[in-house]
Amino acid sequence: MSVPGDVRGRGLSEPPNLNREEEEEEESHEVLLSVLAQHGQLGLCFYDSRDFTLHYMPDTSDNHQLQLLARVVQEVSPHVIITSAKQERCMVQFMQGLGANPDYRPEVVTYPNVDFGLEVSKQRLLSAHLPFLPPAVSERERISYLSSCISFDSPLMLRSVGALLKCLDRRRVGVELEDSSVGVPILQFHTYTLKDVVYVDRDTYSVLQIFKSELHPSVYKLQSGEKEGLSLYAILNHCRCKFGSKLLRQWFLRPTRDLVVLNRRQEVVRFFSCPRNSDSLNTLQASLRNIRNIPTLLRTMSLSHTKVSDWQGLYKTVYSAVCIRDTVRSLPQSIQLFQEISEGFSDDLYYIASLISRVVDFEGSLAENRFTVKPNVDPAIDEKKRRMMGLSDFLTDVARRELEHLDARIPSCCVIYIPLIGFLLSVPRLPSMVEKEDFEMEGLDFMFLSEERLHYRSQRTKELDDLLGDLHCDTKDMETAVMTQLQTTVLERSACLYKVLDLSAELDCLMSLSHASQEYGYTSPTLANHRRITLRQARHPLLELCSPVFVSNSFLSSETRERVKIITGPNSSGKSIYLKQVGLIVFMALIGSDVPAKEAEIGLVDGIFTRMQSRESVSVGLSTFMIDLNQMAHALNHSSGHSLVLIDEFGKGTNTVDGLSLLAASISNWLKRVPAEVPHILLTTNFHSLLQLGLLPSSGLLSLLTLETAVDGDELVFLYQLKEGICRSSYAANVATLAGLPPSLVQRGVEVSELYRTGKTIKRIDRPSTEEQANKCVCVVEKFLCVNLEDQSVDLQRYMKEELLPSGGDLL
């Protein structure tokens, strides 16, 4: 074999070996997921040893089936799952389900609940091995930096981080062969969002008033909870059942960019928003009022703790579900949700409804406060009840015959039936019957004394017990057996009931959005996967409800031009409202709702980032400006070309020059990116020098806007109309006058501002500044200049005391 052939052969054989090494390296990486679930909230994080990155997901709500956690596990595929040994039942069931899956069985590690302590977890995070930080960094600086990387306002997530760090240190993931002093490195922190779920943080939810909790006005409910104030959720939530409201809240907490899901929602909203379909809307909403919490009902049945009210609730639920199905079947089946309801609400519902109707005697059950069955269900039960109904006359006849054999002193008697005891002879207590020995009668067995009546068991009552038995208890036992059989039948067909819950909740949410669209005059937006956003005559969904007149404004952001909009204008001119308006409209589109605009075309975004409000936290002692910087850093580091960024007055919390510099640098950072990576940015500022000094690079991506105002004499009039241009004046004095500041104070402010702008001396007004004082100042300065400070023979103390102080003392 020739040498070239050998060389060529090795050249062909080496790449497969390299590929195998790469595959082995790929397979050797490990993903560890730490999760904690409490009271419907979920916090989790995971570490990927391939790139030494810690991914975290802020606390979010999840249902009792932990569907959100299931999606995370499906996407991440962790090798190890870390959780607390003290967990809720839903988490235990979830882990058992993972263990039963033969195709995927991650290792489950449980730590004591103390290892998930909040303070312990914070200390572990502060002590983590972060190679990108200088060794000499102080604890305070480390806290400031970490607060910009990870949210300290999510306690469940922070606790899961603490447990994850402990597991990493124990297993020494990625540093198994290193010295024990070498810690597991964390090279970066990343916020984790599920595929097609839009990132929206807590600050954004708060500043846009998507949710707003208020104390309940009722004095009886001050301690029990809160009520929803004026918020987007409050005005869109017209759901008729609780689980519909709960699902709508989940949609708000997880806005999606999945076009298939959004189109599915939009077609239902469009259908019910049409006035000619209002009858169907009202009929369905009336039926939805009767849908109860099906999982709770079925769980009660499985434990055999079913009450009469539970049977009533189940019957109303199933009957209403049948009515919903019949109504929906008359609607267009081209709409996917209608088709699923028509098929998913199977005939099992009608079977369950008719079975409950035939078996359960609701009137009798309410009267006896227990489960009773209707006639003709069980002949044996009917016979028992027939005997009990005729028992009164029969016992009267027996008592008459018993009286003939009693002591002549006994004036009357009766035969009574007591459940569990049986038939007894009851006679009145005579005055001579004082002691227990006086109660004894021949042929009778004394049982007890109650309410001045003596109760005995006679031969005839014993015969009645043998003949009739314990009618009441026997009937109750037989009816309980029927109830158990009915429960079993219902539970066997429970799959259709869970479909009722899911589809009814979705239908309720979409009809709620349709109701809001009709009431407030919304428009169905056109959604697409491009990077454009176009809004014509858009309105603020909350402010228009509080103001008699609202001025609409448009918004346009194309893929390659005018993506960065800088808005200037006086205070109170509507800059912040415009930012919130755009943010809310985009958010509404991401949950499938119609929007307050004449026309809307919205390219789906992957995140909404805001720097508008400093939400201070006691968990991390940061200044207001530091919180602002963290929000800005988060937007700079995590926004993409498909994001929406809203920035309001960034930089005002520090020195003017420093704030202006940071603002200019941040905008320049975005403008220097390639157009495909520049997000939609709306920025308001009162730093007019940002534009006047030319601190920003010229770019077609930049658009300068202002809000129109008019000056009528000394009065400033806000027109709230957006137009292209720059605001040349802040009109601070006019705004101060509108705010009610004293005219003298405003006038003084104008004078000082003009003197400062022109570089002239600002004279004090608390005492007169005379020419004589100015001359004295010149004299003192000249005497200072005459002194040779380098001359060692000069006695400065004597010079100050004898020369300077006498001439300049009254200036002090």
PLM regions and their residue ranges:
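Amphipathic heptad-repeat alpha-helical coiled-coil/stalk segments that mediate oligomerization
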Residues: Y319-G390, Y417-H455, C509-P570
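ATPase nucleotide-binding head domains, primarily ABC-like/P-loop NTPase cores
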Residues: S154, H238, M433-L464, L510-L812
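Charged, surface-exposed helical/loop "interaction arms" that form contiguous linear patches used
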Residues: D474-A528
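Secondary-structure edge/capping motif, primarily at the C-terminal ends of alpha-helices
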Residues: F272-D279, L298-H305, V328-P332, E402-L406, ...
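Conserved phosphate/pyrophosphate-binding and hydrolysis machinery centered on Walker-type P-loop NTPases
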Residues: S154, G225-E226, P255-L259, L281-I291, ...
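Charged catalytic and DNA/RNA-contacting regions of genome-maintenance
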Residues: M1-F271, A286-S302, T306-D397, S698
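Flexible, glycine/threonine-enriched loop-and-boundary segments that flank and lead into catalytic domains
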Residues: F394-S412, T523, H540, P548-F550
